[in-house]
UniProtKB/Swiss-Prot annotation:
Its EC number is 3.13.1.4. This is 3-sulfinopropanoyl-CoA desulfinase. FAD binds at residues 121-124, 130, 153-156, 273, 340, 344, 367-371, 388. The gene is acd. Substrate binds at residues 244-245. Binds 1 FAD per subunit. It catalyses: 3-sulfinopropanoyl-CoA + H2O = propanoyl-CoA + sulfite + H(+). It is an enzyme of class 3 (hydrolase). SUPFAM superfamilies: Acyl-CoA dehydrogenase C-terminal domain-like (SSF47203), Acyl-CoA dehydrogenase NM domain-like (SSF56645). It comes from Variovorax paradoxus. PROSITE patterns: ACYL_COA_DH_2.
Length: 399
């Protein structure tokens, strides 16, 4: 259904060459040190794989989300951290800014992304994860500025990202106007007064990107940096969720890439490992496991590419949800089954299989849990709304 064009095959080949020669050899080190791979990010930037979905008029390549997932899969297959960075530099916050921001806002963000920045999107809070609309971070209008107070949780890239897209409840004269989004820029190690990078949350997998708390203490943001105004059907929180569909497809593709890499490594082990005096590939039970894994991976790939190509500006919300559910759960199963081909040696830290299992585990949680996405899909099928409460402002006012 999605035979790649000659241009896409060339794009895939270039991505694979970079990923396998530069990122795969350092993937274990990135996992062990848990340090942000600055040198690899520079290589990614120099190859033109950051900001590639941005319009040509501002320095991007004008590539589609389908093009982007082709690249993301290759990066994630080599190194999960580089796969996630590729998503965030092409399919995350930058997509929302490109769609809803002013030309001036887009230039600020695009220039930094094209220079190698991975934007951070600040949504989740300690008590507002899947129920994101219950966020209590507030932005009070004071003249030409908004004063932001609150905290965010599990922010990918906290401490390394320059561009931050911060979502908060907007208050005008003390009245809740709904959720809006603001651009705030960190300059290297220097944060604007009031933006505090909190403690790092050490993760089970995909360890090369820091996940942190971020706190806002009277952070002052000019009104010109309000990129997603609150209220209205196509504004505020609704706009965010539409733009977020691309990030979900990207996250699912990272899971796919991790699983594809694990499968290929497991398949080689299946061919070369001997037990009971013969190759274990001769055992029908393992043959069927391999056949199922291959089928599941191909199905996930087709769902993700179908979702990436859907929609006029962003992937269709339901197609994105279905694709991410299936890809993430497939990745968890395939990585575990691939480890099984290795036996006890696959469980050891010197073997990449245990890293693949840990990396894949993230994706049934991050970017929308498998359960909340199922609720979303079911809600559309049954004509029901998500079970989100509407008392977010009551919590804000009580702070």
């Amino acid at each position: 259904m999605y035979d790649l064009t000659s241009a896409q095959l060339d794009l895939q080949a270039r991505a694979r060459e970079l990923a396998q020669t530069k990122f795969a050899p350092t993937a274990a080190q990135t996992d062990q040190t848990e340090e942000y791979p600055w040198k690899n990010v520079e290589l990614l930037r120099d190859a033109g794989f950051m900001g590639m979905t941005l319009p040509k008029s501002i320095g991007g390549q004008g590539l589609s989300y389908l093009d982007a997932v082709i690249v993301v899969e290759e990066m994630a297959k080599a190194c999960a951290t580089m796969g996630r960075i590729t998503v965030e530099a092409n399919m995350g916050a930058i997509g929302a800014i490109a769609k809803y921001g002013t030309p001036e806002q887009l230039k600020i963000a695009a220039d930094l992304v094209l220079a190698g920045d991975k934007p951070a999107i600040c949504i989740s809070e300690p008590n507002a994860g899947s129920a994101a609309s219950e966020m209590t971070t507030r932005a009070d209008r004071q003249g030409d500025h908004y004063i932001i107070n609150g905290e965010k949780y599990w922010i990918t890239g906290g401490g390394v990202s320059k561009v931050h897209l911060i979502f908060a409840r907007v208050l005008e004269d003390g009245v809740d106007q709904g959720i809006g989004g603001f651009i705030c820029v960190r300059d290297g190690e220097n944060s604007p007064a009031g933006l505090v990078i909190g403690r790092r949350l050490y993760a089970m997998g995909v360890r090369g990107i820091p996940e942190t708390h971020i706190e806002f203490h009277d952070l002052k943001v000019h009104k010109s940096m309000l990129v997603v105004p609150p209220g209205g059907l196509k504004r505020g929180f609704a706009s965010l969720m539409t733009a977020y569909n691309a990030q979900r497809v990207g996250a699912g593709t990272v899971a796919l890439g991790i699983a594809q890499g694990a499968f290929e490594e497991g398949l080689e082990r299946l061919k070369t490992r001997h037990q009971f005096g013969r190759p274990i590939a001769e055992f029908q039970g393992l043959q069927w496991m391999a056949a199922d894994m291959s089928t599941q991976l191909e199905a996930a790939r087709l769902l993700l590419r179908h979702a990436a190509a859907s929609g006029e500006e962003f992937p269709d919300i339901d197609k994105a949800a279905r694709a991410k559910i299936f890809a993430a759960e497939t990745a968890n199963k395939v990585t575990n089954d691939a480890l099984q081909f290795w036996g006890s040696s696959g469980y050891g830290r010197e073997n990449p299989m245990e890293r693949h299992v840990r990396d894949a585990r993230m994706f049934t949680i991050a970017g929308g849990t498998a359960q909340i996405l199922r609720t979303q899909v079911a809600g559309k099928l049954l004509g029901m709304k998500l079970p989100q409460t509407r008392d977010g402002f009551a919590k804000v006012a009580a702070r």
